[in-house]
Amino acid sequence: MDLWNLSWFLFLDALLVISGLATPENFDVDGGMDQDIFDINEGLGLDLFEGDIRLDRAQIRNSIIGEKYRWPHTIPYVLEDSLEMNAKGVILNAFERYRLKTCIDFKPWAGETNYISVFKGSGCWSSVGNRRVGKQELSIGANCDRIATVQHEFLHALGFWHEQSRSDRDDYVRIMWDRILSGREHNFNTYSDDISDSLNVPYDYTSVMHYSKTAFQNGTEPTIVTRISDFEDVIGQRMDFSDSDLLKLNQLYNCSSSLSFMDSCSFELENVCGMIQSSGDNADWQRVSQVPRGPESDHSNMGQCQGSGFFMHFDSSSVNVGATAVLESRTLYPKRGFQCLQFYLYNSGSESDQLNIYIREYSADNVDGNLTLVEEIKEIPTGSWQLYHVTLKVTKKFRVVFEGRKGSGASLGGLSIDDINLSETRCPHHIWHIRNFTQFIGSPNGTLYSPPFYSSKGYAFQIYLNLAHVTNAGIYFHLISGANDDQLQWPCPWQQATMTLLDQNPDIRQRMSNQRSITTDPFMTTDNGNYFWDRPSKVGTVALFSNGTQFRRGGGYGTSAFITHERLKSRDFIKGDDVYILLTVEDISHLNSTQIQLTPAPSVQDLCSKTTCKNDGVCTVRDGKAECRCQSGEDWWYMGERCEKRGSTRDTIVIAVSSTVAVFALMLIITLVSVYCTRKKYRERMSSNRPNLTPQNQHAF
């Protein structure tokens, strides 16, 4: 059965579905509280260093600066059985964020000496840096299963302290010591540059590693006050990496590119990101900043930046039916075998105008490339930019091809595209587009239900967004009665729903989208003994679609603290008064299996136990023997068996000059001696060849 073409779904044309009947009871996984990492740990009675850092004795007074505390670019991990199922899925999603924005990768442990063991401990915590202890623990406990929390804890493991502990902290924030819980004042200490390196990156209020303003408070007043008041509600964000987080991480690990990112283009530069026009079409895509019939501005800047804001436009009003304009991306080289193409489309022409997405894939047998149609898009003109995702499965060198095709209908405008992003990630399964969004924030009418969607397994579902609260927006996932219910397993087992409020930044690497995941537990029961995720026709309440069709909706599962209204109005969550919520529901039942446990490789620590490397040298094993790998900089280095000797460019120059002078002096001496000996020998030879004039000969004359 084609899940996307079910008969009862076709006539649901409304984007917002608001039930006129009673809302079923929602289960709030956060208990109505917006708890940060430190609130969770404090509530558990944990007294960890800086709230979520586990220290060993050797680390208490030692720096983590130095290569020996770095992990390899591919980090081995184990997801322990103690982890909740939802946490396992969230951790894997967090790894995808690392791959998209950095060169850091993660792989299941295969016997490597050092690896990260992720388990459900008490609270959320990690050590800082690679402790080289073999199994290094990282806890994702109850209520820690948020993607940015996982990113935060893994940044600790990668070698990062909290942002507000850097040495220049007091230039940017004020610590209100009298408002801090007694005995927790040490969590606000700062550390010198020889303990924690800021990597020459400015102080970052937006860092995912920064405390919130309420951290360790003994009342209701903030413990941290930003010296620039605009950042008061910015610090402590738990959405995603900030730009500076990424800058520091990529510097620390010498990342020159990220793993799964492929391309991004907002057409701000005249070279249009290396895209090329086809010579075999009838028209061209034009780089413009506005079109009389729309759009009036690009999507990147929405007309807010004078002198910038461009997009590509195919004018279908000036060509004949069937005419095409073809724009091809630069050549791209895939590594993973799956990609997601994302872009915005504006149709100001006819609803019969069409955008076709092709892939031109190259091979040794076909150097011109094989053209394959991937997606045909026909859109009713709506007067706004529309977001699209297209799934690709390319394994060879390729180009993405955008073909605009003139339809049979009358056109006064054409097709426009902007903000293209391509990455080797999975596309979301569905997009919930909410127009005229700001009217719902804090309004009694701000309770919205999405259209019905289907998961890849065939489960029907809806999303409930509650914007009516004064300070926070809530989001909940509901199963609803659907066409496949007779063929599905009930209670619904281990389906993870990921709901992402999209940050519409033009570059996917700079987005800080807000994401929350929940997982259906088939064993979860309600107070009356029913299974929470049982068939909606059995446990749900009656509801109505906007066209009057009756269905049943199961209980909601989510959070009332999805995002604050203040954060919702920040960044590019709302753009052109449009909001996009990306939805993915996937089966994660395979994560129930125990990860294969292997025998650890021979310990490097054992082989290096009798080898002491000086000057931050790192002991490594080569050909079964321990040796020191010495530190080096741009103009200095350590050398010797134990890195005990220091060398520098200056020393080398001095040695080179001294050697040159010595050689010159030696050659001069040799030359002078040679000249002296030659002259002496010449005089002796001349003396022996001179005639012997005696007195007798003189008398002969």
UniProtKB/Swiss-Prot annotation:
Annotated consequence of substituting E153A: Complete loss of activity
Signal peptide: 1-22
Modifications made to the protein after synthesis: Phosphorylated by PKC at multiple sites of its cytoplasmic part. Phosphorylation dcreases activity at the cell surface, leading to diminished substrate cleavage. N-glycosylated; contains high mannose and/or complex biantennary structures.
Propeptide: 23-61
Chain positions of site Mediates preference for acidic residues at subsite P1': R238
GO molecular function, one term: metalloendopeptidase activity
Cofactor entry: Zn(2+)
Enzyme class: hydrolase
Membrane topology: Single-pass type I membrane protein
Keyword set includes Oxidoreductase: no
Result of altering T694E: Almost complete loss of phosphorylation
CDD domains assigned to the protein according to its UniProt record, in alphabetical order: EGF_CA, MAM, ZnMc_meprin
Cytoplasmic topological domain: 674-701
Residues annotated with Phosphothreonine modification: T694
GO cellular component terms, A-Z: extracellular region; meprin A complex; plasma membrane
Protein name: Meprin A subunit beta
